[in-house]
Every structure is written in C-alpha cells, then in structure tokens.
C-alpha cells in the first residue's frame, strides 16, 4: 500500500513516499499526488518526505502532551510525517500541503496558495479563487467555458500558476446536478468516495 507521488510542476516539486495502513488511503493519495514517470524517479532518487498514515495507531495523550489520541506530526529534520489515529484521508493531503507551504518558498521561490484556478482557453488569462474549505472554490473553478487548472492547492512562480496536485478534492456531500453539473458528473465516475 505504498504510494510514490509528487506535488508540483517540472523541476519545482517534492516527491513523497506515502505508506498507508488502509488500501482506501492509498487509493485516495494516489489520485491526489502527481504520478512521476519512471525516468523522473530514476533522475531524482529518494523521496523528499515520507508520510506514514496509521489510523490504527492511537497516541497516548497523557504521555505526549496531546489533547487527543489522533495526531499529525511533522519532523522536518528527518523529513517524516506521521498521520496517526484518524482514518480521514484528507489529513494525509493536508499534511503534505503544510510541508509544501514551508518548503516551496524557501527552496524553490514558489508561493503556495490554498485556492482554485482556471484559465480562459483563448486569452490564457488565469482566475484564482481564494477561500476556506467549503466556501465554493471548486464550484467557481468548474466553469464549463474555462479550462480547470485545479481546485485546491496551487503554486505561483515565474512560470505562472500551476496545480500542486495530480487530482481534485471536491466535497461530495450535497452535490447538485443542476448547480454543479461538472463536479456532479465527475464524482459519478468514481467507484469509491473517500
């Protein structure tokens, strides 16, 4: 259930090895991370970060000074992320983006952004939509007259705006075929919702 993927574009990306306890987590993160080509894996060597997704591991709050048995722990020195005590696959994605928020500006001169983005197919003008989770970024970016760049996490560099992810992160609860037809139809193609 190990998944090797990357986040970013061209030479501006970080590779992660994600070891998952559950197959559903591996399926989720495989869709969210860009999948590197064999030649890219050979060229870049070891992953930049290792993510351990262990929903079955419960932290002892008394020993660790936590307020819950679930935890997301990031060790920048060892380049390891532990997602423990939670089966919510979104924590894997969000923990990797937290690392990208720190590393991209420092190591690659890229501004990471929690936003959606689309592009006019004729003028190539880009629209960027910022907002908290659940505020409509995905809906705004899924405009049938524009090209979707991505719906949640982007980078802004000298090359322009690019999607950090390899997939989209649409919320499925309450989707309406009339108001959000592109998103509604896209999730109907999937066999599993995580």
Which role fits each region the language model picked out?
Residues 2-13, 193:
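Single conserved hydrophobic/aromatic residue that forms the stacking wall/gate
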Residues 16-19:
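Short Lys/Arg-enriched alpha/beta "domain-start" segment
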Residues 21, 26-56:
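Extended, Lys/Arg-enriched charged tracts that mediate electrostatic binding to polyanionic substrates
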Residues 65-103:
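Charged, amphipathic alpha-helical linker segments immediately N-terminal to NTP-binding catalytic cores
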Residues 114-132, 142-145, 155-192:
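Glycine-rich, often acidic-flanked micro-motifs
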Residues 136:
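Conserved glycine(s) of the Walker
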Residues 139:
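Conserved Walker
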């Amino acid at each position: 259930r190990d998944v090797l993927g990357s986040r970013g574009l061209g030479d501006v990306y970080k590779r992660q090895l994600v070891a998952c306890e559950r197959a559903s987590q591996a399926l989720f993160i495989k869709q969210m991370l860009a999948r590197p080509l064999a030649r890219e894996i050979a060229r870049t060597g070891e992953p930049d970060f290792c993510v351990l997704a262990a929903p079955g591991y419960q932290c002892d709050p008394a020993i660790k000074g936590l307020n819950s048995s679930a935890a997301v722990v990031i060790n920048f020195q060892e380049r390891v992320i532990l997602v423990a005590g939670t089966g919510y696959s979104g924590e894997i994605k969000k923990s990797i983006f937290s690392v990208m928020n720190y590393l991209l500006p420092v190591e690659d001169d890229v501004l990471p952004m929690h936003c959606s983005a689309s592009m006019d197919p004729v003028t190539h003008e880009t629209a960027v939509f910022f907002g908290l989770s659940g505020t409509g970024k995905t809906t705004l970016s899924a405009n049938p007259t524009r090209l979707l760049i991505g719906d949640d996490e982007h980078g802004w560099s000298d090359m322009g705006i690019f999607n950090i992810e390899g997939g989209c992160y649409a919320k499925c609860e309450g989707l309406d075929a009339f108001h959000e037809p592109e998103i509604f139809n896209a999730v109907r193609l999937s066999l599993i919702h995580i």
